UniProtKB/Swiss-Prot annotation:
Active site, per annotation: D402, D423
NCBIfam families cross-referenced by the UniProt entry: PME_inhib
Membrane-spanning parts: 35-55
Source organism of the structure: Arabidopsis thaliana (Mouse-ear cress)
Protein name: Probable pectinesterase/pectinesterase inhibitor 61
Note: The PMEI region may act as an autoinhibitory domain and prevent untimely PME activity during transport.
Family membership noted in the UniProt record: In the N-terminal section; belongs to the PMEI family. In the C-terminal section; belongs to the pectinesterase family.
Acyltransferase keyword on record: no
Length: 587
């Protein structure tokens, strides 16, 4: 299909400057990071981080492992749970102390070895930072460095947590961070796949450095989930009570009282730390200046108020170190962050986002995010979110193909309006969209509209898209010609794609088949697509696809697995916008 994610990227711009973010201190920072990881590993009582045993590459479990030592029974039992048992055995045997370790200790060793391999991949990849690269190659390369760095951070937290893991909430954290690390790896390699025929030695070095990383994380997921059986398959994080019919008007317990007050307070009454105003009446005139000024690793909520206006700045980003940032605008359509970058500008999809947020605790309310590149320029992201515990409340996300990138970690969207054409809600976060309006727009000729493209790659990832109590609508231009442009609920980007629509109102622009193939029979057996108690002219299930992975959900117990409380671990952080929300199925 001409509008596939990895299809034509459009003409390149020979006059465009290198879009890469300068990383002059990356190698120094990487060395510092490795030293810090050594201390972290020592703190949790593992073998000194400086003792690194190279992990031999294997054929993903399809060939006999290259062993010089026989695995212990504990290693054999542990690795029997994994999808890549030969790699698992080799990884554990290569790590000092594994031959005397019990199964619980082997989980820790597996995490540690995987962290070391990611750290080594980051360092190896960073050694070519100053190599001259074409713009698209530089974009893919810089994406990989950022994503590998984020993965090292996620795995460090997972390694520290697995030692003291004691309850459902900690289990969910570990699974989330592992899932995020795998997603980051896949996004890195996908970026190089997008630049077909380019990359050369840069691509070879990076892809070589990240070899086996996804499989190693998969093994960590499998052996950890095997120990925590509640987390296999569709994760049910909180097993203490069923929340299928429970309704709560409470604000989430993961928020401090001050944060709850901020979320429920009118904009005019909020004392912001920074005010952005185009007319110069605030602290800064640009959002970029405000983000730069915000503290790193903040343990308290830092509030940036962006006054009404149209802000077009160069690919704004809230990085991983900018934690607990809250952006408040003057309302949808009033405070507008806009841009027009696309893959036609020699960028990977990851780098096209008008606004991106990867810092944990990111919250935004009452704003519009827009990418105006248009359907002819293919992938063009308006908003990308990859921060854990992210909340997007009362916002517009407006684009065409790939408008909203729910990249990774746990996210919650409430009362938002999302506009797009092809795969316009995509990614591999564990995300719930609740009480949102989802608008299909008129695409280019011959295109089919697909609302979701979820890219869960591994059956143990606790990720997916849950669309709960939303409205699926057509924009006026599509409404006038909807017979020519079928709209589908989604298509499977990766093998274990998972999307559920629950208690939502579907317009008659939804095709009776409901769902669309990605490429022939790919993933039709392994995906999980579900529908539960939807209504509207487009909700009929009589002509829906007959794929093995498609489910008409009739059980409240099954449906409850995709609610706020269970799917994104409401017992620990219950996403909220500061107004009433429902943690179970009831509205």
């Amino acid at each position: 299909m001409g509008y596939d994610r990895l299809g034509p990227s459009g003409p390149s711009n020979p006059n465009q400057k290198d879009p890469a973010t300068s990383l002059p201190e990356l190698q120094k920072k990487t060395k510092t990071k490795l030293i810090l990881f050594t201390l972290a590993v020592l703190v949790v009582g593992v073998v000194c981080f400086g003792i690194f045993a190279g992990i031999r590459a294997v054929d993903s479990g399809k060939t006999e492992p290259k062993l010089t030592r026989k695995p212990t029974q504990a290693i054999s039992r542990t690795c029997s749970k994994s999808l890549y048992p030969n790699l698992c055995i080799d990884t554990l045997l290569d790590f000092p102390g594994s031959l005397t370790a019990d199964e619980n200790e082997l989980i820790h060793i597996s995490f540690n070895a995987t962290l070391q391999k990611f750290s080594k991949a980051l360092y190896t990849s960073s050694t070519i930072t100053y190599t001259q690269m074409p713009p698209r190659v530089r974009s893919a390369y810089d994406s990989c460095l950022e994503l590998l760095d984020d993965s090292v951070d996620a795995l460090t937290r997972a390694l520290s947590s697995v030692v003291v893991v004691s309850g459902d909430e900690s289990h969910s954290d570990v699974m989330t961070w592992l899932s995020s690390a795998m997603t980051n790896h896949d996004t890195c390699t996908d970026g190089f796949d997008e630049i077909e025929g380019q990359g050369g030695e840069v691509k070879d070095q990076v892809i070589g450095a990240v070899k086996d990383l996804s499989e190693m994380v998969s093994n960590c997921l499998a052996i950890f989930a095997g120990k925590v059986k509640d987390l296999s398959g569709v994760p049910v994080v909180n097993n203490r009570k069923l929340l299928g019919t429970e309704e709560t008007e409470e604000l989430p317990n993961w928020l401090k009282r001050e944060d709850r007050e901020l979320l429920g307070t009118p904009t005019s009454a909020i004392q912001a730390d920074i005010t952005v105003s185009k007319d110069g009446s605030g602290t800064f005139k640009t959002i970029a200046e405000a983000i730069k000024k915000a503290p790193e690793h903040s343990s308290r909520r830092f509030v940036i108020y962006v006054k009404a206006g149209r802000y077009e700045e160069e690919n704004l980003k809230v990085g991983r170190k900018k934690t607990n940032l809250m952006f408040i605008g003057d309302g949808k359509g009033k405070t507008v962050i806009t841009g027009g970058k696309s893959i036609a500008d020699d960028l990977t999809t990851f780098h096209t986002a008008t606004f991106a947020a990867t810092g944990a605790g990111f919250i935004v309310r009452d704003m519009t995010f827009e990418n105006y590149a248009g359907p002819a320029k293919h992938q063009a992201v308006a908003l990308r979110v990859g921060g854990d515990h992210a909340v997007v409340y009362r916002c517009n996300i407006i684009g065409y193909q790939d408008a909203l990138y729910v990249h990774s970690n746990r996210q919650f969207f409430r009362e938002c309006e999302i506009y797009g054409t092809v795969d316009f809600i995509f990614g591999n976060a564990a995300v719930i969209l609740q009480s949102c309006n989802i608008y299909a727009r008129k695409p280019m000729a011959q295109q089919k509209i697909t609302i979701t493209a979820q890219n869960r790659k591994d059956p143990n990832q606790n990720t997916g898209i849950s669309i709960h109590a939303c409205k699926l609508l057509a924009t006026p231009d599509l409404e006038a010609s909807k017979g020519s442009y079928p709209t589908y609920l989604g298509r499977p980007w990766k093998l274990y794609s998972r999307v559920v629509y629950m208690m939502s109102d579907m317009g008659d622009h939804i095709d009776p088949r409901g769902w669309l193939e990605w490429n022939g029979p790919f993933a039709l057996d392994s995906l999980y697509y579900g529908e539960y108690m939807n209504k509207g002219l487009g909700s009929g299930i009589g002509q829906r696809v007959k794929w093995p992975g498609y489910h008409v959900i009739t059980s409240t117990v099954e449906a409850s697995k995709f609610t706020v409380a269970q799917f994104i671990s409401g017992s620990s952080w219950l996403p909220s916008t500061g107004v009433s929300f429902f943690s179970g199925l009831s509205q």
